[in-house]
Amino acid sequence: MKHLFASTLALVIATTSTVAIAQTSGGGDAPKQHCDSGYVTGVGGAAQSFREYLALPDRDRYRYFADHQIQCKISDEGRAFDCTGVTNLKHEQMSVYDDSDGATITVTSRVELDQGTYPAIIVVQRKDVQCGQ
């Protein structure tokens, strides 16, 4: 039930954020927004899993999301590492780790795992990032 709710919420958020971006963008080639921190809302995950998720047609993303929930190992210092899968982020605070890609951005954000909530390095769509405090 939790996965169904999270998956449905992710789909609604993804659709809503796409519409909002389309309404606010003036078209043309806008310069890439640079920021060091902010918030992220949408689907994100381990690099390989997130690439697989984005490569799927929209109709197959729901099933992929449900079948590939994020899982990570936890270090002695309390950090998530060696992650696989994807997760839904709801206005999570983040710090930019790598913004060299045009469509995605690698961030450090807290993710909810079976063991609790831990900081992890994940990839999200650039359009899902809101810069600022």
Regions found by a protein language model. Give the residues of each.
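N-terminal secretory signal peptides
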Residues: 22-82
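Bacterial N-terminal signal peptides that target proteins for export
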Residues: 1-8
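SH3/SH3-like beta-barrel superfamily modules
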Residues: 24-33, 83-129
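N-terminal signal peptide c-region/cleavage motif recognized by signal peptidases
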Residues: 15-19
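Repetitive helical segments and hydrophobic/amphipathic motifs
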Residues: 11-12
